[in-house]
Amino acid sequence: MKMIDFEHVSVAYDGENVLHDIALGIEKGQHTAILGANGSGKSTLLKLFSNDIYPRFNPKMRKEIFGKSIWDIWELKKHLGIITNDLHYQFSERAPDLNGFEVTLSGFYSSFHIYEHQEFSPLHVQKVKEVLEFLEISHLRDKRISQMSTGELRKCIIARALVHEPQAMILDEPTVGLDIKAQINFIQLVRKIARERTIILVTHHLEEVFEEIAQVVLIRQGRIYAQGDKTELLTDAHLKNVFDLPLHVGCENGRYFVQSIGD
């Protein structure tokens, strides 16, 4: 069973297609990077994964996640943890006084606060402790969001998703706003999570594609340009077409990077 199984999926805004006849397959355990330029359709594809939007009707269409075409959004979140920069913004703006423990605990109700009517059992509390320890961020338990760095809050938001023990995690440009040291540290954390869960990385940063990612999906102008082994697709020729830039790609110790730009 494929974790993600899309065929003939299109999405339109105001009658105009922004995703065209998408065919996409991702197996469980198949760590995948979805790469494309800004405006290529990555964000729209991400909303399809989360069921925040729905595709245009097509009798040939198949849109299945974990083998199901219809999901209750709340139930889907238990299987598929999605980490976006919007989540980071929402917590920063709406709940600056929450601490790391509370951010993680809020995942059980998918809320941005802890409310009096919410009931938490000793098992919930224990699970939060276990996740914080697994991510090595127990020191953030009592630290308020307003005092956290960008990377610290992002780790707490990942912890929030992990309380459900999802089968897979989708990370949307996870190192945006992090300095070089924090980027390295964060990618190491994601690699640790990848030992137990499928990772789907949505990005336009080649440097975020870590070693365990074997499959790459290249998206260009709302269409899947190519899907396959990263060693075959992360080349000068393919990335030049996808990003409309004369890129020269380097690879060292399994990590890819833009070596230079120009003919």
What does each model-found stretch correspond to?
Residues 4, 18-21, 141:
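Conserved structural motif at the start of ABC-family nucleotide-binding domains
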Residues 105, 120-140:
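Conserved ABC ATPase "signature" region
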Residues 163-167:
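A short, proline-enriched helix->beta-strand linker immediately N-terminal to the Walker B motif
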Residues 169-173:
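Catalytic Walker B motif of ABC-type/P-loop ATPase nucleotide-binding domains
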Residues 209-211:
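A short, surface-exposed alpha-helical micro-motif characterized by mixed small hydrophobic
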Residues 215-229:
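H-loop (His-switch) and adjacent beta-strand-loop-beta switch element
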Residues 236-263:
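ABC ATPase nucleotide-binding domains
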